Amino acid sequence: MAHFAQLDENNVVLQVIVIHNNEVGNLDFPESESLGVDFCKAHYGDDTIWKQTSYNNNFRKIYAGIGCIYDPVADIFAAPKIESP
């Protein structure tokens, strides 16, 4: 199974979905990403933003979760920053 994180315009993760490996040509990351993004856009809208994430291999540093932030320069996901009271 392949996991894809939907991002908002500020690169914050909105949701993570799972799609079958057949939808990404049974390829491994990074070759699988463009096929998965195309699949996600076909189902959620062409104006959506998607990045592949993985809890098995942990490419992009960590597995993306809701509220995580994608850093496009470093090409990683980071945990959300929690401000102290």
Residue map of PLM features:
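Interaction-interface detector
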Residues: 1-85
